Amino acid sequence: MVDYYEVLGVQRHASAEDIKKAYRKLALKWHPDKNPENKEEAERKFKQVAEAYEVLSDAKKRDIYDRYGKEGLNGGGGGGSHFDSPFEFGFTFRNPEDVFREFFGGRDPFSFDFFEDPFEDFFGHRRGPRGSRSRGTGSFFSTFSGFPSFGGAFPSFDAGFSSFGSLGHGGLTAFSSSSAFGGSGMGNYKSISTSTKVVNGRKITTKRIVENGQERVEVEEDGQLKSLTINGKEQLLRLDNK
């Protein structure tokens, strides 16, 4: 039987934040769109990770799971045994894509994957769950909070977000925009994310396009293309001048 703690790679005493971090990492790793050559296994892993997160991120479900295992969530302990469970008629897991979209709040998750954490390279710390965790930049990061999530009733989705922030004392200005759209089967999924930072007068723009399993990353400095990467492989550039 699958152990949800093992699925997420966390200890049984893991905190709620540990559970979120583990889900975020594994959901991005095993998303079927990122594994076009191994889609069957990816879909299975992606579903397991979503189920584990659904249970372990909810205190009540996690308590029942810790005491009775998955059978407790199914509403029975087997062998005619009986225990007090709020899921006596069985707990129904949601579509893993719905869990995924809700977790990322409608934002483009793959742009977050590219930067590991939004603007971590710029500011050196992570965004809190409501955007107010980081000192001095809470109002900037809070721009990301409250973005509408997408429910399972929609057969397709089209999402976008943008944000702008600056730190006067650091001489740095950052701007990020992202859009994602695709069908419910995610077969036509496409995401475009652009992140720009200005450091000491130099404008550095990173554009990332993911479409049907192919990733293209362009980095420009002051409008000049400096690097191009396709599916993780850097491409040779022909520049007229340096």
UniProtKB/Swiss-Prot annotation:
Q: Where in the cell is it found?
A: Cytoplasm, Perinuclear region; Nucleus; Cytoplasm, Myofibril, Sarcomere, Z line
Q: Which InterPro entries match?
A: DnaJ_domain (IPR001623), DnaJ_domain_CS (IPR018253), DNJB2/6-like (IPR043183), J_dom_sf (IPR036869)
GO terms under cellular component: cytoplasm; nucleus; perinuclear region of cytoplasm; Z disc
> Which stretches of sequence are listed as region Interaction with HSP70?
2-146
Q: Keywords, A to Z?
A: Chaperone, Cytoplasm, Methylation, Nucleus
Coarse class of the protein's main subcellular location: cytoplasm
The alphabetized list of GO BP terms reads:
chaperone-mediated protein folding
Positions carrying Omega-N-methylarginine are 135
Residue intervals of the J domain? 2-69
Q: Which CDD domains match?
A: DnaJ
Q: How does it assemble?
A: Homooligomer. Interacts with BAG3, HSPB8 and STUB1. Interacts with ALKBH1. Interacts with HSP70, KRT18 and PTTG.
What name goes with this protein? DnaJ homolog subfamily B member 6
